[in-house]
Amino acid sequence: MEKSSSNFIQNGKRDHGGKLRQYNYKLEEAEYRYFTEERLFYRRRNPVEKIAQRIPKPQIEGTFTWSDELRCNYDGNTQFLPVEALEGCLPLEKLNQHLKPGFRLEVVVRPSLDPSITTKSPEIRWFGEVTAVCGFYVAIKFVGELNRRPCWFHMLSEDIFDIGSGLKQDPAMKWLQYRPLSLLKPMQCPKFWRRGSTPAPPVPRPTEEILDEFQAELHENRISEPKIFDQLRHLAHRPSRFRLNQRVELLNYLEPTEIRVARILRILGRRLMVMVTAQDYPEDLPSVEAKDRQVQHENVEFWVDESSFFLFPVGFAMINGLRTKATEGYLEHSRRIAEGSGSYHKDDVTFEQLFAGKPDISAEKLNLLKVGQKFELLDPLSDLRQSFCVATIRKICKTPGFLIISPDETESDDESFPIHIDNHFMHPVGYAEKFGIKLDRLAGTEPGKFKWEGYLKEKQAEKIPDEMLRPLPSKERRHMFEFGRVLEAVGQNETYWISPASVEEVHGRTVLIEFQGWDSEFSELYDMDSHDLLPAGWCEFFNFKLRHPVLPVNDPNAENGEYD
């Protein structure tokens, strides 16, 4: 018996040569395709309103793109750090379970892929299979396109959907069509995809075979959960818990014993642009010449993650006896907050708002922390973070979990600053030696002669209990940080600056990141949990400029990059 024809071609008959020889389509204006996990069939439904054309955001002028690196990924020359290695970069859970090689998707076909499409055309979609995942980018091979290389899409773009989503949006198929890329002209498209009075030519045999295989695999758990991409985009775009123009207390990075009042002026996901403005400053703002990156001036931006150690809620400084530079009105307001006799202003960032999500630490455990305890510190205020230093707890704050700490390099309190015990910078005694990180020597100590045991005995001090500091990430996650894997990294001093970068070394939970185009002397240490490490594609999603790698002046490609 003749093998039944493809389920993608309804009511057609096939001769022994495999060609369609007659069609018995019943044409109705409102008939449409409905996709289940097993087959396609028609149902009647009233037409729906036109689906709005999804137009990509205009690309920022001068921004770097990952196109060359993505092409190199096919040849195995470039490997990307996976999204799941960077926990918390976006509020997306188990993303890798929904986007991995072999998954089937529904993809919007844009004019760059099909020149026959215009802004007045119906939205064209076709089916594809994920072949690779690189950061926030996925490579998708279109069904039936044997001679076309996979195309790259941003996994959070408006170009990829779960199977069947188009039919739910436009059941009558009036403003949306499904069409293979190889069939550019309308009359080349099989009648199954474009109904008309003229019979369509047969689908080429290779394409038909792939469509059969594609359909057969739909019930093999190779399709994403319904509406998963809409849910992921919703999570990525969900409103921040902060609002524009809210005021927050900000650690002065030039004088870390001082707190200033700042305003939230921009919000991109977890990243906030916070600036000290004239309305909250008790005197004239420091001039541009002062090179204070936190003060509002033209072309000056200070960006931090919403969990940054720079940020504190209104009233924090007053409660903990920290020096505050602010107007008399603010000082009086925060004093009432600290005393419990006043209420927050609607623009105040409160303790509950800023510290939402911070782990609760029991009083019993907090009692293990003592003034004078020592530890190893990746100094977040250092100009270049390439080593650890010896540091000490100077004070226990009234706000539970907060400490005043400082490096032992100076006996002065001028370098001390407040920080929560749950942070990325404090490490247990012996961490640097165990994982091969340079520990800055103290004054009077010969190179390579520093020993923790002798130092603690000399200072009559004890080390901070290891259980008070963050544990190592899982071995599985640490192994994701392989040498050479690329990502986007925020400059830890120039916080408005995000650059393409790669993993250079791994030391326990600490990674040395090299900025593309920069010498290794500018590489910096980051914690694996740092929110300053971002997957490739973060800047594109949030429409933030990704800096070009620095190129030598004599480099022929220097006109496309930035000069050293």
From Swiss-Prot:
Q: Give the record's GO CC terms.
A: nucleus
Do you know which InterPro entries this protein is assigned to? Mbt, PcG_chromatin_remod_factors
Nucleotide-binding in keyword set: no
Q: Disruption effect? A: No visible phenotype.
Q: Which PROSITE patterns match?
A: MBT
Q: Which processes are annotated in GO (biological process)?
A: negative regulation of DNA-templated transcription
Name the UniProt key words of this record, in alphabetical order: Repeat
- Entries under Pfam families matching the protein: MBT
* UniProt-recorded Gene Ontology molecular function terms: chromatin binding; histone binding
SUPFAM superfamilies cross-referenced by the UniProt entry? Tudor/PWWP/MBT
MBT repeat segments: 64-176, 205-327, 331-442, 450-549
Q: How does it assemble?
A: Interacts with histone H3 that is trimethylated at 'Lys-9' (H3K9me3).
Under what name is this protein listed? Malignant brain tumor repeat protein 1
| Taxonomic lineage from the root | Eukaryota, Metazoa, Ecdysozoa, Nematoda, Chromadorea
